């Protein structure tokens, strides 16, 4: 029992059929009880001229992250794992963003950037804009779930929890931006709702210096979940025959 991987166990004690190499230990899951979460891969967060770039954050390294997310999505779809896409933002009038009575009004760097630089005439993170849209290289397909969210966590004021429970999903595999903000916030909230959370580290990117990426991943693997990578995810989802090494 002590040598068994981490992960959800059914009432009979059976763990999942797929074992993923991860830190701090391997974690097992069943593909039909797992979702791949793609967090906020919008122009706002991953493209020059988007919100993060305009707010002074470095987005120059997001290209390889987008490519690895595409690989993770392809592997998940091939294995029958549900793909869930999040888009962070608000209505065009910013009612959902909250006014001065909301901490979001004071802490959101998008809202602060627009107030500080009104001459830009930007509509950052507003639904229906280029900023809000997913990057061209990543597109949902039929069968995927696309959800908007008005705050960092994908569980806040969204139907995510009920959608997951209705489908018997217990394990959430995370990719996206930003590791230290929306990815970690959603994984933490999932942890408190009894979901097993895994981050594919090389398919995420931080908002801020690299030390924030390192700190977020260390925090997750120590307290809230597991950390793996795209190559390990792809390998774990290969049929047994494909994983065997010829003698």
From Swiss-Prot:
InterPro entries: Isochorismatase-like_dom (IPR000868), Isochorismatase-like_hydrls (IPR050272), Isochorismatase-like_sf (IPR036380), RutB (IPR019916). SUPFAM superfamilies: Isochorismatase-like hydrolases (SSF52499). Keywords: Hydrolase. GO terms for biological process: nitrogen utilization; uracil catabolic process. The keyword Hydrolase applies. It is an enzyme of class 3 (hydrolase). It catalyses: (Z)-3-ureidoacrylate + H2O + H(+) = (Z)-3-aminoacrylate + NH4(+) + CO2; (Z)-3-ureidoacrylate + H2O = (Z)-3-aminoacrylate + carbamate + H(+); (Z)-2-methylureidoacrylate + H2O + H(+) = (Z)-2-methylaminoacrylate + NH4(+) + CO2. One of its GO terms (molecular function) is hydrolase activity, acting on carbon-nitrogen (but not peptide) bonds, in linear amides. The active site is at residues 40, 149, 182. It holds the Pfam family Isochorismatase. Its EC number is 3.5.1.110. Hydrolyzes ureidoacrylate to form aminoacrylate and carbamate. The carbamate hydrolyzes spontaneously, thereby releasing one of the nitrogen atoms of the pyrimidine ring as ammonia and one of its carbon atoms as CO2. Belongs to the isochorismatase family. RutB subfamily. PANTHER family: ISOCHORISMATASE-LIKE DOMAIN-CONTAINING PROTEIN (PTHR43540:SF6), PEROXYUREIDOACRYLATE/UREIDOACRYLATE AMIDOHYDROLASE-RELATED (PTHR43540). This is Ureidoacrylate amidohydrolase RutB.
């Amino acid at each position: 029992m002590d040598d068994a991987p981490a992960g959800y166990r059914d009432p009979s004690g059976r763990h999942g059929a797929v074992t993923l190499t991860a830190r701090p230990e391997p974690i097992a899951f069943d593909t039909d009880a797992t979702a791949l979460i793609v967090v906020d891969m919008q122009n706002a967060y991953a493209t020059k001229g988007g919100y993060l770039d305009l707010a002074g954050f470095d987005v120059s390294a997001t290209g390889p992250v987008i490519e690895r997310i595409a690989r993770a999505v392809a592997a998940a779809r091939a294995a029958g794992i549900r793909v869930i896409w999040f888009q962070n933002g608000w209505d065009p009038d910013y009612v959902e963003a909250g006014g001065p009575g909301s901490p979001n009004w004071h802490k959101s760097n998008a809202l602060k950037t627009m107030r500080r630089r009104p001459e830009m005439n930007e509509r950052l993170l507003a639904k229906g804009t280029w900023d809000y849209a997913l990057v061209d290289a990543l597109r949902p397909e039929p069968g995927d779930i696309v959800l908007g969210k008005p705050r960092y966590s994908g569980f806040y004021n969204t139907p995510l929890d009920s959608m997951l429970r209705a489908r018997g999903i217990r394990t959430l595999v995370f990719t996206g931006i930003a590791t230290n903000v929306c990815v970690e916030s959603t994984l933490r909230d999932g942890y408190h709702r009894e979901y097993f959370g895994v981050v594919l580290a090389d398919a995420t990117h931080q908002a801020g210096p690299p030390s924030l990426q390192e700190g977020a991943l260390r925090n997750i693997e120590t307290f809230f979940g597991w950390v793996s990578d795209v190559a390990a995810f792809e390998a774990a989802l290969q049929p047994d025959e494909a994983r065997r090494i010829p003698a």
